[in-house]
C-alpha cells in the first residue's frame, strides 16, 4: 500500500512530469520504448521523482501507450520514483491494478456538455465511475493512490466560463467517493492567476489534510503565472512536461502543458526546494529532439539559460 504522505510529503512541493502521458497525446511521432526509458532515467538522474507514465487505453487507438506496462516496470525499478497512469473505465482500472502502478489517475469533466461530448456520459455517471475505481482499489492487493482530475475546471471548450461552485461540488463528490486527492485542470488554458488562486484556495480549504494538485496548460502564455498563483494559494503538487510537450484536442494551436523546466525554476525562485538539477533537466531535451524530430519544444530556460550562465548541453546542441 502506497501512502499519500510518503509520496507527496506535507509542506513540500512535488512536481510531476506528465510528458510521457499528457505530452504524447497529440504528437505525430512518439518516442520508442527505449527512448521513453532514457527520458525517464535521465530525468530521474536530474532529481525528478514523479512521472505520469502513460494511459491504460486501447492500443489500437492510442499506440503511443501500447508499452505502458513496460514503462510502469521501468519507473518501479528506480528507487524512490513514483509512477502514475491514467485509467478512464473499469477495464482500464483493472489493467492498471494488474500492472502494479503506484497511482491511478482518472478524470471528471467540470461541465455536463463536455462530459457528454468527451466521455459520452453524464457527470453523475463519471462520479459513479470514480467510486467504482476506488472500490476496485480498496479490494486490490497493493492499493495504489487514486486521484481524480476535474478537467475544464477553469474554463470549458464548449460552454466557456465555468461556475467555480460547480467545480467545488464535483471535488467534494470525488473526495466522498474515496479518492486520495483531486487535481484541478485548466485543460484548455483559459484561466488567469486571479481565477486560479481563488479556486485553488477554496479547494485547498475543503481538502483538509489531503494535498491538491493543479494541472495547467500554457495555451495563452499564462501557465507560469498561474502556477505561481496556485503555489501562493496552497497547492503543493504541480504538473508540467519537458519542453512544454502536449496540447489539447479541444484547443487547436495550444502550446501544451506548462514547461517542466521553467516550472522547476519558478518553484526554486519562490523558495520551494525541488531537489531537481535544472541544467541536467534541460539537457534531457536532447532525447526528445532525437526521438521526435520536428516536434516543437518550448521553454524560457532552454532559450535564455539560467541567470548565472548557460544551461549547458541544451544551448550547445541548439547552436551546433
Language model features with spans:
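Catalytic cores and adjacent flexible loops of soluble metabolic enzymes
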Residues: 1-320
Amino acid at each position: 500500500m502506497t501512502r499519500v504522505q510518503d509520496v507527496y510529503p506535507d509542506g513540500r512541493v512535488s512536481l510531476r512530469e506528465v510528458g510521457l502521458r499528457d505530452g504524447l497525446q497529440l504528437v505525430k511521432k512518439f518516442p520508442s520504448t527505449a527512448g521513453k526509458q532514457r527520458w525517464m532515467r535521465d530525468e530521474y538522474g536530474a532529481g525528478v521523482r514523479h512521472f505520469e507514465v502513460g494511459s491504460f487505453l486501447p492500443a489500437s487507438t492510442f499506440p503511443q501507450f501500447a508499452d505502458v506496462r513496460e514503462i510502469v516496470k521501468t519507473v518501479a525499478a528506480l528507487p524512490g520514483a513514483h509512477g502514475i497512469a491514467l485509467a478512464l473505465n473499469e477495464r482500464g482500472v483493472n489493467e492498471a491494478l494488474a500492472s502494479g502502478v503506484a497511482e491511478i489517475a482518472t478524470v471528471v469533466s467540470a461541465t455536463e456538455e463536455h462530459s457528454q461530448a468527451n466521455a459520452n456520459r453524464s457527470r453523475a455517471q463519471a462520479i459513479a465511475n470514480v467510486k467504482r475505481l476506488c472500490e476496485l482499489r480498496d479490494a486490490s492487493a497493493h492499493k495504489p493512490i487514486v486521484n481524480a482530475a476535474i478537467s475544464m475546471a477553469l474554463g470549458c471548450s464548449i460552454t466557456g466560463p465555468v461556475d467555480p461552485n460547480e467545480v467545488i461540488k464535483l471535488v467534494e463528490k470525488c473526495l466522498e467517493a474515496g479518492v486520495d486527492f483531486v487535481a484541478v485542470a485548466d485543460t484548455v488554458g483559459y484561466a488567469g492567476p486571479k481565477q486560479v488562486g481563488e479556486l485553488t484556495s477554496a479547494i485547498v480549504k475543503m481538502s483538509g489534510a489531503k494535498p491538491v494538485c493543479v494541472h495547467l496548460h500554457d495555451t495563452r502564455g499564462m501557465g507560469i503565472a498561474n502556477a505561481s498563483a496556485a503555489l501562493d494559494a496552497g497547492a503543493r503538487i504541480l504538473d508540467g512536461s519537458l519542453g512544454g510537450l502536449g496540447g489539447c484536442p479541444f484547443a487547436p494551436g495550444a502550446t501544451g502543458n506548462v514547461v517542466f523546466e521553467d516550472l522547476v525554476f519558478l518553484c526554486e525562485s519562490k523558495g520551494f526546494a525541488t531537489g531537481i538539477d535544472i541544467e541536467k533537466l534541460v539537457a534531457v531535451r536532447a532525447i526528445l529532439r532525437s526521438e521526435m524530430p520536428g516536434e516543437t519544444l518550448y521553454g524560457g530556460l532552454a532559450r535564455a539559460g539560467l541567470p548565472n550562465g548557460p544551461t549547458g548541453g541544451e544551448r550547445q546542441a541548439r547552436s551546433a
